[in-house]
């Protein structure tokens, strides 16, 4: 037994005040198990050391005596996860049970409802672009007007993401879901009143409402996964939630060319077909809105993971939305991920919006084939999303997986670019599928990686910022690629995207992998988080002369 005394170095000295009643051990301490038991009253401490020498102990004690340095900006909010007084205990500490966790069967219902109304919203995003030439003829507008029916989704997201994420963080998951589903339903019904050739502004109004609904939809997958699903299924749940949006885009590529064929010589038939598509969409959106009201709940009775339990038990009064945003932008790995996610997702949005124009440049009159190629692109991406989700749940290898998928997305874009004009439709189907598999499969990877490196910040805030970056890059890429496609050729526009994707690879390689949420779950499960009482040498009042606690936490995974 070795006692920490003045010869070895005081465990706590004047000028080194505890943080929230706890003293944080610096990350570079020597390995070895440290257990402690309180003996001879609250001030005496005996440490049983396995594999730790007295010299190492002295070095550790000396480190504790140094003045405490401020936490890094991205780590400040972690203090709200710790108990605030010496009388409280850390989850997983020896002698105290971890918070009760359980998985609710309702989680599958919540996930299904969200995926379905997200599907309808994505369908309404792409339903104009995939038959852009048909709507140009019906409304008598230019191709740029039809492109804006897609880009309005991206434009609306940027200014509205901050109030939307604030609402999610302060008012909760259910209200955000109700707004997303309700506005999606309202926008669908407004478009039903636009089936006349002079009412383009009405269809734009309906599309604007749907774009506002999207703001309350895109940031929810990672929040739903974290709040409702356990550590071993959270990545798969996030991928499934993203899958609903991708499936909507896939159906948006498939159904409009079938429901609204190009019958410009018969305007009445064309109006009837457009009306059928609009009324069918609004009926489904209304049904899903009612399901959301009835069955979508805020959270389960018990948290599904220790990380979620720690967040739910943190004092809500200490949470600051502005501080959370500030911490995220000071987190260098997250800023790099923000840029790289925006590049690859913006490229996908641009390709999806302009796919019909690219295909019809080389394959005249093949609107249905263009829709099927878009369907292939998105369906392949759905498979990629699910496989990536399973892979992350199984391995927890975020950085390497993200980098590999990014590289393969770049290669897929290069192959698609230089095979598009060969005149072989089957080649375009195959290359489009390869491109979609990796590019769309990246989406849940970005969400989950962001949650890991920004924990304990809100999942909705990090996801919302990622989507905002995607919308900004999507608008810029769509305008630039559309201009290059019109003035030069589709190949020129695609090469433009290839250059940006290559830049994204370089930035992804620079991201430091710091899996905070995963380390919290693993640390508690393995008992790696220890609470070690130490002698308090500071002159306090008799009531304050109690043992302090050193929280020893597992070090974060280092960068590659």
UniProtKB/Swiss-Prot annotation:
Bias-annotated ranges (Polar residues): 550-560
Signal peptide interval: none
Gene Ontology CC: membrane; mitochondrion; plasma membrane
Topology, Cytoplasmic side: 1-99, 171-172, 229-233, 296-331, 396-397, 454-461, 513-560
Alphabetical keyword list: Cell membrane, Erythrocyte maturation, Glycoprotein, Host cell receptor for virus entry, Membrane, Phosphoprotein, Receptor, Transmembrane, Transmembrane helix, Transport
Residue spans crossing the bilayer: 100-124, 143-170, 173-192, 200-228, 234-259, 266-295, 332-362, 367-395, 398-420, 424-453, 462-487, 490-512
Pfam families: MFS_1
Residues engaged in binding ethanolamine: 214, 471
An example Gene Ontology molecular-function term: choline transmembrane transporter activity
CDD domains in the cross-refs: MFS_FLVCR1
Biased composition (Low complexity): 83-95
Keyword flag Metal-binding: no
Xref: InterPro entries: FLVCR1-2_SLC49-like (IPR049680), MFS (IPR011701), MFS_dom (IPR020846), MFS_trans_sf (IPR036259)
Chain ranges on the Extracellular side, renumbered to this chain: 125-142, 193-199, 260-265, 363-366, 421-423, 488-489
Binding-site positions, choline: 471
An example Gene Ontology biological process: mitochondrial transport
Cellular compartment(s): Cell membrane
Family annotation (SUPFAM superfamilies): MFS general substrate transporter (SSF103473)
Modified residue annotations for Phosphoserine: 56, 541
Residues modified by glycosylation: 265
UniProt main location, coarse: membrane
Catalysis performed (reactions): choline(out) = choline(in); ethanolamine(in) = ethanolamine(out); heme b(in) = heme b(out)
Membrane topology summary: Multi-pass membrane protein
Stated role: Uniporter that mediates the transport of extracellular choline and ethanolamine into cells, thereby playing a key role in phospholipid biosynthesis. Choline and ethanolamine are the precursors of phosphatidylcholine and phosphatidylethanolamine, respectively, the two most abundant phospholipids. Transport is not coupled with proton transport and is exclusively driven by the choline (or ethanolamine) gradient across the plasma membrane. Also acts as a heme b transporter that mediates heme efflux from the cytoplasm to the extracellular compartment.
Similarity section: Belongs to the major facilitator superfamily. Feline leukemia virus subgroup C receptor (TC 2.A.1.28.1) family.
Record-given protein name: Choline/ethanolamine transporter FLVCR1
Organism: Felis catus
The encoding gene: FLVCR1
């Amino acid at each position: 037994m070795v006692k920490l005394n003045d010869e070895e170095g005081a465990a706590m000295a004047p000028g080194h005040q505890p943080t929230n009643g706890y003293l944080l051990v610096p990350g570079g301490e020597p390995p070895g198990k440290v257990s402690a038991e309180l003996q001879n009253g609250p001030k005496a401490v005996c440490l049983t050391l396995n594999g730790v020498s007295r010299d190492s102990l002295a070095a550790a004690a000396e480190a504790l005596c140094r003045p405490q340095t401020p936490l890094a900006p991205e780590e400040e909010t972690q203090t709200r996860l710790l108990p605030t007084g010496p009388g409280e205990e850390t989850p997983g500490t020896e002698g105290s049970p971890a918070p009760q966790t359980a998985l609710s069967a309702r989680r599958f219902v919540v996930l299904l409802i969200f995926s379905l109304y997200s599907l309808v919203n994505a369908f309404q995003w792409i339903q104009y672009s995939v038959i852009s030439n048909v709507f140009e003829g019906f409304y008598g507008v230019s191709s740029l007007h039809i492109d804006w029916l897609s880009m309005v989704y991206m434009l609306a997201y940027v200014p509205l993401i901050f109030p939307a994420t604030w609402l999610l963080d302060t008012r909760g998951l259910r209200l955000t879901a109700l707004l997303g589903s309700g506005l999606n339903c309202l926008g669908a019904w407004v478009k039903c009143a636009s089936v006349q050739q002079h009412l383009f502004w009405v269809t734009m109004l309906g599309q604007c409402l749907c774009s506002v609904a999207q703001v309350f939809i895109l940031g929810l997958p990672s929040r739903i996964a974290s709040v409702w699903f356990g550590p071993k299924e959270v990545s798969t749940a996030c991928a499934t939630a993203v899958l609903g949006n991708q499936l909507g885009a896939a159906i948006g590529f498939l159904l409009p060319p079938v429901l609204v064929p190009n019958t410009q010589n018969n305007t009445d038939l064309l109006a009837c077909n457009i009306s059928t598509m609009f009324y069918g969409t609004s009926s489904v959106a209304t049904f899903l809105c009612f399901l959301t009201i009835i069955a979508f709940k805020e959270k389960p009775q018990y948290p599904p993971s220790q990380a979620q339990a720690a967040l739910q038990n943190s004092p809500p009064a200490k949470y600051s939305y502005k501080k959370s945003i500030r911490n995220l932008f000071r987190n260098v790995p997250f800023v790099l991920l923000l840029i790289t996610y925006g590049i690859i997702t913006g490229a996908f949005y641009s390709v999806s919006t302009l796919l019909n124009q690219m295909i019809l440049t080389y394959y005249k009159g093949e609107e249905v084939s263009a829709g099927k190629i878009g369907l292939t692109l998105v369906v392949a991406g759905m498979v990629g999303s699910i496989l990536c989700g399973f892979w992350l749940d199984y391995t927890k290898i975020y950085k390497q997986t993200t980098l590999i998928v990014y590289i393969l997305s770049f290669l897929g874009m290069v192959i698609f670019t230089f095979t598009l004009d060969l005149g072989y439709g089957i080649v375009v189907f195959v290359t489009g599928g390869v491109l979609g598999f990796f590019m769309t499969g990246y989406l849940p990877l970005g969400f989950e990686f962001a949650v890991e490196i920004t924990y304990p910040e809100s999942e909705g805030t990090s996801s919302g910022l990622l989507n905002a970056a995607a919308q900004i890059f999507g608008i810029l890429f769509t305008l630039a690629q559309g201009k290059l496609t019109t003035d030069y050729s589709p190949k020129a526009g695609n090469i433009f995207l290839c250059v940006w994707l290559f830049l994204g690879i370089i930035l992804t390689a620079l991201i430091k992998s710091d899996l905070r949420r995963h380390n919290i779950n693993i640390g508690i499960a393995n008992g790696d988080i220890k609470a070690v009482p130490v002698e308090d040498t500071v002159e306090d009042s008799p009531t304050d002369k109690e043992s302090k606690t050193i929280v020893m936490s597992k070090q974060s995974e280092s960068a590659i």
